Structures are given as C-alpha cells and as structure tokens.
C-alpha cells in the first residue's frame, strides 16, 4: 500500500508525535505492515523537482496512490483562492494539489484535528479561511465537500487529535493496508472507532476522586479536575488513558485537564481551558450519557460518602493519607 503524506496549515505536531511510535524500528514496522511511504516531509529526502514529479505522477495516474494522508488544515484564503499557501516550486495552492490527489486516492486520511475540522489554525476570526478536509468545524463540508467519498468507498477518515497518538495513525494505516477497515469502523464523525468509542475518562488514575466528587482546586492537586479545572475527559472520545502516550503518560496523568482535542471546535471552547464553566454551581459540560438530574443526585450522595483519605488527598499534591491496612482474607 502506497502512502503519500502532505503537510498543510499546521505545526507539524502530528508528525513529531508519529516519530515517538512505540517501536525501535519505525521503517521496519511500516514494511512489515505492507506500507510503502512514497513521501513524508520529515522522513523523506526527495525535494524540489523530484517531489513535484512524484506528486504529478500520483495526480495523473502514473503512480498508484492508495492512501493520501493530509496533516494540517486547508487554507482557503484569501477569498477562496488558497494563495495563502502555495506548494513550494509550483505556484499552485496546496488546496488544489489536495483536491487533485484526493480524487485519485483509494483512501484519504485526515491526520490530526487541523486536517479533520480546521483545528487551532481556524481559531477566532479564522483569517486564513482554514478548514478540514471534509468538515469546517462541526459542519460537514470542508475542502472536499460533505458528499466526498474516496475511490475505496469511504469518506475522509478523521484521525482527530492535537496531536494524534502515533498508535491511532499507525493502526489506521495498518488496517487499511490489510483491507480490514470499512464504514462500520467509523463513528458518526468519521473517526476510527477503535479509539473513538472510548472516553479519556476510561482508565484515568483520578477515577476514585471522580467517583466521590473529590475535586482538585488548583494545579498540582490530585483530585478530579472535572468540577473546577476544566477537564472534559468524561466527554472526550479517545483512549488516551488506556493506550497511554510513550507507554506511560496522558494529559490527566501529567496533571493537565483534558481539553477534548479530538472534538470539532475544541480550540474555541468559549471559556479558559483550565476553568470549568458552571450554571448555579453545576458544571455545564456533564459526562457523556449522564442526565443532569441524575448527575446532581449522584454528586450529592457521593460527596456525603467521601472517605477522609480521598477528601484530604484531593486538594494536596501528594498522598497525605494512605489507604488503611486491613486484612482481606476471610479467616
């Protein structure tokens, strides 16, 4: 399976993350999966006329293109011309190259939230007219249009995240190479379900604090960050706390609130990332699938039953009260 990777309007963070894939032999891993990387801006030597010839060959059908990966948002400005971002040496807007290559690719993959929805590049007034491949924020459309399907029959596969976990990208490419990826493997936002059917909350090491609604009050506190610190882990679709980053970490494990970076529009939440917006003292963003009345009732009951150990540790930066030592055997 031939893979062509292009970078558009973004920081390159998804590529940097990919280079941290949990393997000692990244090229060997791709080869074992039957993946040939035609070109990647950080991993390939080709440039100038050699690269342009490759892109022309892919676009014109002389080189088979199985998977087109696009990293970074698509810059349509000014006034829809795309001339804010010209591919070096061609004088042609990147959006025109992407349209032409997407039309002949068997599959198209948006790598990261910028390529999927517009992401950070589309923040605020969006003067660059940035959008995703098939979404403009949470609205279907984007550069290629809501009705786009690649030659393989699938819409754009949105491997969203800022940045993406290297495993999300590699697993997607491996599944495509093995012909084991179909429409049933996409969630309603066309994200791969193998990671999007989970919540960041799943596997969070702060779950005991969440269960008792023992909340952190400031950075470095051990407690749950949902109530006060802006954490959206109970709403964000990703497997960050079960897959982990570099085999051992995640945002919440590092003491940072989840900002739901796999979600369209995460870059403009309408409030500071580190604060939880509330109405009458109740967080506006309640856990996925949790009715407000039930959450309020559960929170009240949980707080009334909070052990002293959990309550004390929640607002400390280290364990101040250790679990009691008790016999667990029946006799």
Label for each model-derived stretch:
Residues 1-241, 248, 264-271:
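Iron-sulfur-associated redox domains of electron-transfer enzymes in respiratory
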Residues 149, 280-281, 331:
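Mid-to-C-terminal functional-domain signal that highlights helix-capping/loop sites
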Residues 197-325:
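Long, compositionally biased charged/polar accessory segments in the mid-to-C-terminal portions
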């Amino acid at each position: 399976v031939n893979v062509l990777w292009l970078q558009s309007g973004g920081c390159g963070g998804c590529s940097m993350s990919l280079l941290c894939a949990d393997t000692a032999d990244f090229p060997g891993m791709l080869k074992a999966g039957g993946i040939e990387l035609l070109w990647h801006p950080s991993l390939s030597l080709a440039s100038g006329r050699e690269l342009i010839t490759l892109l022309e060959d892919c676009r014109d059908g002389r080189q088979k293109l199985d998977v087109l990966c696009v990293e970074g948002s698509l810059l349509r400005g000014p006034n829809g011309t795309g001339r804010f971002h010209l591919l070096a040496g061609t004088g042609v807007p990147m959006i025109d190259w992407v349209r032409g290559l997407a039309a002949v690719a068997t599959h198209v993959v948006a790598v990261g939230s910028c390529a999927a929805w517009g992401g950070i590049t589309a923040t605020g007034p969006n003067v660059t007219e940035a959008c995703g491949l098939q979404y403009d924020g949470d609205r279907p459309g984007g550069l290629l249009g809501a009705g786009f399907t690649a030659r393989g029959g699938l819409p754009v596969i949105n491997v969203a995240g800022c940045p993406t976990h290297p495993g999300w990208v590699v697993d997607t490419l491996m599944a495509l190479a093995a012909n084991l990826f179909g429409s049933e493997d996409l969630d309603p936002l066309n994200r791969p379900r193998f990671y999007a059917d989970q919540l960041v909350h799943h596997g969070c090491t702060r779950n005991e604090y969440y269960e008792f609604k023992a909340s952190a009050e400031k950075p470095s506190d051990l407690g749950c960050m949902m109530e006060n610190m802006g954490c959206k882990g109970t709403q964000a679709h990703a497997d960050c706390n079960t897959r982990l980053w570099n085999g051992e970490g995640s945002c919440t494990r590092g003491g940072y609130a989840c900002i739901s970076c796999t979600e369209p529009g995460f870059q403009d939440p309408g409030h500071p990332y580190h604060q939880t917006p509330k109405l009458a003292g109740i967080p506006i963003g309640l856990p996925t699938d949790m009715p407000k009345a039930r959450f309020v009732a559960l929170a009240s009951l949980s707080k009334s039953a909070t052990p002293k150990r959990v309550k004390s540790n929640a607002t400390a930066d280290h364990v101040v009260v250790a679990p009691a030592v008790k016999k667990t055997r029946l006799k």
